């Protein structure tokens, strides 16, 4: 009748805790002090972010898109399980959930957008609200950066890049949520990003209890990927896709969880100890998986130098190899998180060696002079210079390897624009490593970004059609090669002096193929994101079409829909509401409205492709590029 009161479990204090970095805020100067070098250009002190009134792209580094559909096996354990068995099963599960940044074919590298910690992921539509991790700022140069919530109207704090997770083989499979990237998560943890304070963690046991808890959570979360009809995905043989871990440090912000239901767990970052274990596992596994992806049970190879050199040599011959080298360099750096400083320096040299295999040899300063800085972003600076041999002006993008949140994304800057040539894509001439900086030499487009035009001018339909036609030609080419841009907006469209339109900023692009037909990362700039990206549903090249439709609204109304609202609220509206309408709908022709309606379709399967849109009657109004020259002149006269 009277049961004995159970004794409360004893919970120890964190062990081996180290307070390595302390960051404060100077109220007098209104800036952060004591920021780590990685964050110095991201939070608080970035003059570019202060002066810019444009929203910033984001990538959410909490998830990675696995390359194959894998169901977690049901594991039945007796109470006397030993640590070894549990640890083995956990490693297997962690391996299954790791994502691949490398493309599945040699056409081009998959761009894996994880650059920083930022505002965040969305909860699946069934669970109610969108939950953003820490606010993220990404400059126009395609880098995610995090900072405080938006204070300026046009500065968007957007969710960080969500590592890619696996998409169902069928395009219509409405899987929601993402697989864990291998990190330990306590009960209730969710891979989505949140405003989340980093908690101290015990140096921790990997015994049966910890493993069983994590395994159970993985199984519970994996169940969210099943179609809503209740049918389970067919079981497939377990494989181990190549993984890459987000190495960027995440900023510490407290958060409030709102509206989690339906079995979804509130997102949570792995603790520092969890990250170290996760990174060490992936660093060990990454080498053999890159070499032999068809044999998932290959044993990890201890010699990272040899694997790095091999993968780097492959990188010089194909873009897929470049991404592979980037992964291994990233994995090595992740594994060195808890190691001495000497190992960290070695990791930097490994990454630099891998990048050196992709870029051109030599020093560009021997052929370039008269450097003049014209811009700065969160990933680096942009200068114009003169080529001594030809006398032409070129643009030089300089990116410091040590200041990148996701330095493997630098491979996209080199490989994508190098391997894909099209009249409407910015031409890259060469790339170099100068000390610890990556220099990308590309054509200089005097006309600037389309943003200057849509902000200061009003475009007529003939000019809008001219821009759209050239953009669609570039997108049709990229999509035919399996490349998704994922950050289409006016900031990514550059104009030459004669009015030619060119697509730029490929730092967030991704590769799809028959083996990996869909992506699920939360990547892009909030106001231009498609509903399926925000909802974390599998998506393909059709997301670029939605973003282009939003850019058309930009050209008509001067800004994208919901631009006066915070990014989180705008994303929620895009996810839950009908496609946005033009403010000045009464001023546009039925042809333009029909053209827009073909792009802003909530169902990706019903959305027009780039090739289909090129045949739309509205584009018959397109004229020569010279139609845009007066708009560029008008934009130059505005500050």
UniProtKB/Swiss-Prot annotation:
Catalytic residues, chain numbering: 487 (proton acceptor)
Domain of life where this protein originates: Eukaryota
Catalytic reaction annotation: L-seryl-[protein] + ATP = O-phospho-L-seryl-[protein] + ADP + H(+); L-threonyl-[protein] + ATP = O-phospho-L-threonyl-[protein] + ADP + H(+)
Domain Protein kinase: 368-619
Recorded consequence of changing residue 22 to L: Inhibits binding to Cdc42
Molecular function terms from GO: ATP binding; protein kinase activity; protein serine kinase activity; protein serine/threonine kinase activity; small GTPase binding
Compositionally skewed regions (Low complexity) per UniProt: 91-129, 138-159, 227-241, 274-295, 309-331
Keyword line: ATP-binding, Cell junction, Cell membrane, Developmental protein, Differentiation, Kinase, Magnesium, Membrane, Neurogenesis, Nucleotide-binding, Phosphoprotein, Serine/threonine-protein kinase, Transferase
Residues holding ATP: 374-382, 397
UniProt PTM comment: Autophosphorylated when activated by Cdc42.
Cell compartment(s), UniProt: Cell junction, Adherens junction; Cell membrane
Disulfide bonds: none
Gene inactivation effect: In the adult brain of mutants, the calyx, peduncle and the lobe system of the mushroom bodies are reduced, along with other neuropil structures in the central brain. The Kenyon cell body layer above and behind the calyces is thinner. Additionally these mutants have a rough eye phenotype and bristle malformations.
Record family assignment: Belongs to the protein kinase superfamily. STE Ser/Thr protein kinase family. STE20 subfamily.
Protein name: Serine/threonine-protein kinase PAK mbt
Species per Swiss-Prot/TrEMBL record: Drosophila melanogaster
């Amino acid at each position: 009748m009277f049961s004995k009161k159970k004794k409360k479990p004893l919970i120890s204090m964190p062990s081996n805790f180290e307070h390595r970095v302390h960051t404060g805020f100077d109220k007098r100067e209104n800036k952060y002090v004591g920021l780590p070098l990685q964050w110095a250009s991201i939070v608080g002190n970035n003059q570019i972010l202060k002066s810019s009134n444009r929203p910033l792209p984001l990538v959410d580094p909490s998830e990675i898109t696995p390359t194959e559909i894998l169901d977690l096996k049901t594991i039945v354990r007796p109470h006397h399980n030993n640590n070894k068995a549990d640890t083995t099963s956990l490693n297997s599960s962690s391996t299954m959930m790791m994502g691949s940044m490398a493309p599945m074919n040699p056409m081009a590298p998959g761009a894996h957008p994880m650059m920083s910690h930022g505002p965040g992921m969305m909860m699946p539509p069934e669970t109610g609200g969108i939950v953003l991790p820490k606010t993220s700022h990404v400059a126009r140069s395609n880098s995610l950066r995090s900072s405080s919530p938006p204070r300026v109207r046009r500065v968007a704090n957007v969710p960080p890049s969500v590592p890619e997770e696996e998409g169902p083989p069928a395009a219509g499979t409405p899987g929601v949520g993402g697989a864990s990237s291998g990190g330990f998560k306590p009960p209730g943890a969710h891979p989505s990003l949140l405003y989340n304070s980093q908690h101290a963690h015990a140096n921790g046991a990997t015994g049966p209890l910890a493993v069983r808890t994590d395994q159970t959570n993985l199984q519970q979360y994996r169940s969210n990927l099943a179609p809503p009809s209740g049918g389970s995905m067919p079981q497939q043989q377990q494989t181990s896709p190549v993984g890459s871990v987000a190495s960027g440090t995440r900023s510490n912000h407290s958060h409030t969880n709102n509206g989690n239901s339906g079995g979804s767990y509130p997102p949570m970052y792995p603790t520092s100890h969890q990250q170290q274990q996760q990174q060490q596992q992936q660093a060990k596994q990454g080498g053999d998986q890159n070499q032999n992806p068809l044999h998932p049970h290959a044993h990890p190879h201890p010699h990272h130098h040899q694997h790095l050199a091999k993968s780097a040599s492959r990188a010089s011959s194909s873009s897929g190899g470049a991404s592979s080298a980037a992964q291994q360099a990233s994995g090595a750096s992740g594994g060195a998180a808890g190691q001495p400083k000497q190992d960290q320096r070695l990791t930097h040299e490994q990454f630099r060696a891998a990048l050196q295999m992709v870029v051109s040899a030599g020093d560009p300063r021997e052929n370039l002079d008269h450097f003049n800085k014209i811009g700065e972003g969160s990933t680096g600076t942009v200068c114009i210079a003169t080529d001594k041999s030809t006398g032409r002006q070129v643009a030089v993008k300089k990116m410091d390897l040590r200041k990148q949140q996701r330095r493997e994304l630098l491979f996209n800057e080199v490989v994508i624009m190098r391997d894909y040539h099209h009249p409407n894509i910015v031409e890259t001439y060469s790339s170099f490593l100068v000390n610890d900086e990556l220099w990308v030499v590309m054509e200089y487009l005097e006309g600037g970004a389309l943003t200057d035009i849509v902000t200061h001018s009003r475009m007529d339909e003939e000019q809008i059609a001219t821009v759209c036609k050239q953009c669609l030609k570039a997108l049709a080419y990229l999509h035919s090669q399996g490349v998704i841009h994922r950050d289409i907006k006016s900031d990514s469209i550059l104009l030459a002096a004669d009015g030619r339109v060119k697509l730029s900023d490929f730092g967030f692009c991704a590769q799809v193929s028959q083996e990996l037909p869909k992506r699920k990362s939360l990547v892009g700039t909030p106001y231009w994101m498609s509903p399926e990206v925000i909802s974390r549903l599998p998506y393909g090249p059709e997301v670029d079409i939605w973003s282009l439709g939003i850019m058309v609204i930009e050209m008509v109304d001067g800004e994208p829909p919901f631009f006066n609202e915070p990014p989180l609220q705008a994303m929620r509206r895009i996810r839950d509401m009908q496609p946005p309408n033009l403010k000045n709908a009464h001023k546009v022709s039925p042809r333009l409205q029909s053209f827009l309606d073909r792009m802003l379709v909530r169902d990706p399967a019903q959305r027009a492709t780039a090739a289909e849109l090129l045949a739309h009657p509205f584009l018959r109004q397109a004229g020569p590029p010279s139609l845009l020259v007066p708009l560029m002149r008008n934009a130059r006269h505005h500050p």
